[in-house]
């Protein structure tokens, strides 16, 4: 496992400038690996942080075509070609606070090239079709800008971007037409051209930052087509099959055999939750490509929990998301799992919920069961962990096929951290408690420390009574329990 994370879009540009008490509490909830005096975690220990590299819509104001000032971004590049390293200060504050709390993997992602380079002079795709909103003569300029951002953040903030993503959801059928946010579509051929330009720019500057592609909007665009044509589908085959001569990136410096995709729209019905991920993994395995799930939140088709509208601090959303995490890891083989926005508003897209004044200059932040549910994974399954297979048996000792996954009952995954500790994450989706017995073939493991997330005050990775290895334990109804070996 490579880690668990979230992104700073777009709230951190504001919250990062709020009073210290709010900023520090927010950072602790997201990144801390410390415990209180009773052994209860203070935060969820995210190990990956996505930084949105702005395109410059902020300075355009309403002329940007983006309605909300919350979703407009600044840009390090000035119109005259010089750089302004005072830009995006709130986000950069969170970069530093993340690093201070142990985060080591930082991803810089673009929703749009800088507005100075785009076809329409905007960071949205308004008035255009399904191709990249970038002038042909500016591919190299965009790549050089990305290289300068990598250098600038390290020089000014001490932050090393491990990965940079040139595009975000380029296969989205809505084509990123405003007025909601920055974005651009792109064909596979255009993405390959961008990746090669980024590779050349990074190589010339001696940067070892990796180029991550292609942040697909839907898993089905990665191994097939979905609501677009072939030019924006079959991403895995396009970039990692040598027969795809125009788009093959398997021998491009700085481009790892790693695909990033988003699990939006594929979480219901329940059979699709499994089958789509199995098709994805089959294709990834065929071309020897690893996979990161880098973004998701609750959308309108997630009807089981009422869709995305209206924030929910309860276990209803937390368990629904835990089920997605389980399936992405078990059936899609995700080595990393990342939520969309770390902090959001009155929508189910934030781990935390912000309440701000109209100007966005002050406010407060509250936690949610969703935050702590992700923490059942992120706080204990650390970078470098190996996911272990699980053999499940019934009461007679007979093996149960896929016994680690009951979509309406218990779902279990197991890991071994690099330090030798074992971790078992158990999700109980059912409305009644479930009994189970488990053990590992490791003589050093004598007992397990469970951490419970459930409805109720204080039940946020709450340490409860230890369990002996091989002894029966009870998983409370509608809860998530992580067991850590002792």
Which residue ranges define each predicted feature?
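Solvent-exposed beta-hairpin/edge-strand motifs
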Residues: 441-460
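N-terminal catalytic cores of secreted or lumenal carbohydrate-active enzymes
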Residues: 1-161, 174, 181-192, 196, ...
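Carbohydrate-binding surface patches
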Residues: 397-444, 478
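C-terminal beta-strand-rich structural cap/linker in extracellular carbohydrate-active enzymes
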Residues: 463-486
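Solvent-exposed loop/turn segments at secondary-structure junctions
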Residues: 9-14, 54-58, 112-116, 167-173, ...
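Structural recognition of the beta-strand scaffold that forms the well-ordered cores
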Residues: 2-8, 47-53, 57, 105-109, ...
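Aromatic/acidic polysaccharide-binding cleft in carbohydrate-active enzymes
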Residues: 290-381, 385-401
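Noncatalytic carbohydrate-binding groove/subsite architecture in carbohydrate-active enzymes
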Residues: 151, 181-324, 331
């Amino acid at each position: 496992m490579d880690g668990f994370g979230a992104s700073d879009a777009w709230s951190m540009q504001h919250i990062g400038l709020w009073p210290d008490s709010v900023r520090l509490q927010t950072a602790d909830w997201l990144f801390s690996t410390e415990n209180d005096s009773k052994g209860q975690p203070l935060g969820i220990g995210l190990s990956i942080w996505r930084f949105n590299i702005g395109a410059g819509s902020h300075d355009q104001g309403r002329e940007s075509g983006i309605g909300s000032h919350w979703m407009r971004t600044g840009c390090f590049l000035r119109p005259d070609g010089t750089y302004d390293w005072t830009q995006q200060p709130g986000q950069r504050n969170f970069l530093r606070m993340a690093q201070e709390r142990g985060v080591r993997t930082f991803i810089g992602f673009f929703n749009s090239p800088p507005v100075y380079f785009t076809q329409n002079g905007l960071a949205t795709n308004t008035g255009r079709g399904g191709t990249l909103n970038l002038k042909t003569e500016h591919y190299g300029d965009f790549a050089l800008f990305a290289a300068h951002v990598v250098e600038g953040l390290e020089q000014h903030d001490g932050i090393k971007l491990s990965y940079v993503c040139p595009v975000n959801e380029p296969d989205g059928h809505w084509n990123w037409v405003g007025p909601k946010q920055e974005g651009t579509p792109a064909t596979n051929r255009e993405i390959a051209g961008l990746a090669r330009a980024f590779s050349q720019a990074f190589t010339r500057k001696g940067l070892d930052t990796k180029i991550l592609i292609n942040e697909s909007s839907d898993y089905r665009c990665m191994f097939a087509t979905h609501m677009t044509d072939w030019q924006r589908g079959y991403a895995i085959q396009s970039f990692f099959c040598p027969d795809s001569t125009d788009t093959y990136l398997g021998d491009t410096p700085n481009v790892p055999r790693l695909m990033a995709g988003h699990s939006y729209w594929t979480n219901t019905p329940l059979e699709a939750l499994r089958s789509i991920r199995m098709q994805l993994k089959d294709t990834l395995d065929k071309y020897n490509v690893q996979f990161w799930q880098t973004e998701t939140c609750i959308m309108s088709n997630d009807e089981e929990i009422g869709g995305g509208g209206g924030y929910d601090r309860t276990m209803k959303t937390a368990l629904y998301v835990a089920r997605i995490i389980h399936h992405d890891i078990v059936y899609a083989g995700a080595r990393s799992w990342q939520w969309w926005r770390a902090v959001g508003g009155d929508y189910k897209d934030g781990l935390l919920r912000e309440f701000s004044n109209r100007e966005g200059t002050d406010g407060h932040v509250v936690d949610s069961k969703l935050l702590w549910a992700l923490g059942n994974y992120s706080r204990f399954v650390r970078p470098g962990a190996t996911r272990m297979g699980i053999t499940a048996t019934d009461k007679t000792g007979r093996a149960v096929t896929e016994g680690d996954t009951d979509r309406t009952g218990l779902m279990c995954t197991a890991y071994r951290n690099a330090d030798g500790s074992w971790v078992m994450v158990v999700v109980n989706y059912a409305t009644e408690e479930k009994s189970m017995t488990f053990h590992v073939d490791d003589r050093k493991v004598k007992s397990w420390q469970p951490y419970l997330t459930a409805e109720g005050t204080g039940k946020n990775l709450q340490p409860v009574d230890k369990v002996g290895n091989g002894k029966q334990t009870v998983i409370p109804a509608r809860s998530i329990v992580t067991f850590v070996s002792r």
